[in-house]
């Protein structure tokens, strides 16, 4: 696993998602009203995956690999109904497909060698669960004992290497983002493969689009690092190529497919893009040097470390792991735990970013929208929550 995608698994732990009393700060280059402080729907443990189904029902995943249905009640606290689990050390992505099928996506991280948590609750007649395979799309249906493997994303990427890879790992795979389509197929954003894949209802995989690297400048304010920690870093302002790192995918209100980028090292703030891809596309290229041509065109720019996308009637929403960047979080820089949530609205001939819940989210992991309600999960490690914004 390369350095950038490893950061998605090892982002620093924090203890709360809502920051009490923190004054909103102006976000440079971003405009629009800030929504009210998020409301806690229910406490969760290191949540990430979220699929808001409407009528107060939301699918979520947590750090132990479990997936549950959160049911909001008019009078009383929300109820969390466990549905199943994958033995993994990072919460999978989740999406509800047709006929009650739940899709779950594991990344490059798989189950821990020794699952002390599971072993501690096993009885003499029980068998410790096998670690879930990494880089795999699973599906689960009501009545099934456990999720079943459906598509081996990692194996597919071995035969479909990234031609623009910058880290000598062209066959690397870390599927991270997931969206279920109405025809029974599934879209998968592979962070290490820098591409968007489509898995059809039979489990066959095709490459929808490849996201090419972008030349960025090394940001100011990075500390000096010793060689054993990856240093020395290039001087600020040095232009270097940086991989896209496709983390997220959603279907927009216009039916188009939208893909979000984390941005590889040095994770320069403001260089993450959102791409718009025409439905049914195969073999497209998302090229920052020619962003307005072909079947993949740039929809938004100026974001930082995007980890999830969602769509509603008002447009596409982008969730940032950190407004300073994932690399700043990895370095432990002050304030780097603060994430961002933006509604990407149309503005003249382009788009405009409207921030929601300004400075109220810490290392968030997932976002989804139903009606006018925006649901956010996080932080990725430690005590967290499912939140509702709007």
Predicted regions and their residues:
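A short loop-to-beta-strand structural motif that recurs across blades of beta-propeller domains
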Residues: 66-69, 133-138, 195-198, 207, ...
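Blade-edge beta-strand/turn elements of extracellular beta-propeller
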Residues: 32-42, 75-87, 143-169, 202-242, ...
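Beta-rich, blade/repeat-based domains predominating
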Residues: 41-57, 86-101, 106-108, 157-186, ...
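Short, conserved, GDST-rich strand-edge loop motifs in beta-rich repeat architectures
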Residues: 104-134, 219-220, 258-273, 319-338, ...
